[in-house]
């Protein structure tokens, strides 16, 4: 996975050198991509790298189609925002809140069933008798 990230992403020194950079990504799942991009930007001379994530922190497995079936592989489940910021070597890190996500898409989640289970652990269907059993699920 890290080699794939290395091959498809690079930073242009003439653009980022000496600058404060804000990197925006859709999510952080395992942390591999964010860590690598921050490193590329700093190696290219970025003065600071601030990371903003356009989803709430993914703390719970998704059983509805996304390939994250255990808590262990979800970095936001294992680390606080400050710890994750340090791990990816960013100067700052922030996630959009659940409420902020709803507002950004003009969505009333009370009236419609937007699945937020990977963010808050409230699954829309009863998959297992307990969350402990769900966490042992392996694809």
Question: For each of these PLM feature ranges, what is it?
Answer:
Residues 1-139:
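PRPP-associated nucleotide enzymes
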């Amino acid at each position: 996975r890290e080699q794939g990230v290395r091959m498809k992403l690079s930073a242009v020194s003439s653009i980022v050198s000496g600058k404060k950079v804000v990197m925006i990504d859709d999510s952080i799942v395992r942390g591999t991509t964010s860590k690598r991009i921050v490193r590329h930007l700093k190696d290219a001379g970025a003065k600071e790298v601030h990371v903003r994530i356009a989803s709430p922190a993914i703390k719970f497995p998704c059983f509805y189609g996304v390939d994250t079936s255990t808590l262990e592989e979800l970095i936001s489940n294992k680390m606080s925002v400050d710890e994750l910021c340090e791990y990816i070597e960013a100067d700052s890190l922030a996630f959009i809140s659940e409420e902020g996500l709803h507002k950004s898409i003009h969505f009333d989640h009370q009236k419609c069933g937007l699945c937020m289970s990977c963010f808050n652990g409230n699954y829309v269907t009863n998959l297992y008798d307990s969350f402990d059993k769900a966490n042992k699920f392996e694809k």
